[in-house]
């Protein structure tokens, strides 16, 4: 029996992906050189690492509880992966009632011996799988579940689907990006799921499907709907027309691209990469306009404020605001915010560009202002939201308030956390308006509807919820297979798309009444 480091790394990589740690999985694969290994093309069932660990524990449990005469001693105590095992059962045949203590070091030694002797085994006693612990109680969504016939499943990808985006102008088009080294542009046949889809165009990022060095990591339509930008694990940004023809191939980054954003007018494309830099590309000719080197670790997210100012965030715990044309090294940044104590996962400008929100693995979301009259020294956040109990992976501003399509409605900030909750905050009062608490697993994606009347949330348990923003009440539910990586509304507010780890996209019809 042989176990290679590449095989172990591949199991860990798949576990990270299946658990929703997309950035971590990309970083791990990049640093372990996993993309250069042939094992990445090996078919692997979901949950493989957990399955192997469970089987190893079962084997250790059998070995620990076998008596000298080959019988199994009954034991009700848990046999954990890391915690010491205390055997509370009495052994038969006058062995007495002394508990058998097996510590972590002893378990590790036994595991090594077991792996060496596994080929000599001729029979393994059947053992029931260990009970699942700390599982939340099931949630009954039958009253609000989306009925059969009101959703469409798109299933031509061959690996996890990480992101989706509806075209802002040609609203029957939706783009999806996957770990199979492709993006796809799907054309919906009609206004409802019953009409299905008419075609799907494949945008290949590698020589063959499934090339893990070409995973599509991010995508976004241009404001005019004519172009689609995609970022890949190979560090290349690509621009396609809406029919799927390649327009530009942008080569400059030295690591995976984590985020792409078009400027408001569509003149520039902004990219943030694992190589610690952000790049502004001129879309008039597909050329590099300016590269910025302010971060000391991978840049995870970027967002424009107008056509020449942007923000970026990084695993270096900082948020940096830059301006096109200002020197890209030294003291050239407009502002640098360093209030977070862990990796900063996302940054978003409010519709009018007056406020910048950031969220972090430190469990906080912060609202910043460049107006030093509001914040004093300008380096302190205007608001510091600390009510979440675990990492905050993403946040979104509502399309309301000044500078938005719905200026009469109050501005809100939504945050989604690994504590399973979505929270809505007021940037005016700094208070939490609603806690949207129904998910039983970490919430990985949220999206306001165009009117901001509703918000959709998707979790790693495959659950999609639609909530009434004003009342903070869940009104629709849909359960798909696998974990949800992203949710997105169409422009008409009649459909919500959710992309899954099961290689599929669900397009759900939404009827307000």
Which stretches of residues belong to each language-model region?
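Conserved strand-to-loop turn within each blade of WD40 beta-propeller repeats
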Residues: 177-180, 231-234, 271-275, 313-316, ...
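WD40-repeat beta-propellers
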Residues: 183-188, 237-241, 260, 278-282, ...
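Loop/turn segments within WD40 beta-propeller blades
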Residues: 165-171, 220-225, 261-266, 302-308, ...
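Blade-level signature of beta-propeller repeat domains, shared across WD40, Kelch, NHL, RCC1
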Residues: 485-513
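Eukaryotic adaptor/scaffold assembly regions
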Residues: 1-153, 500-503, 508-509
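WD40/WD-repeat beta-propeller blade N-cap
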Residues: 154-161, 203-216, 251-257, 293-299, ...
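A structural motif specific to WD40 beta-propellers
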Residues: 149-152, 194-200, 247-248, 289-290, ...
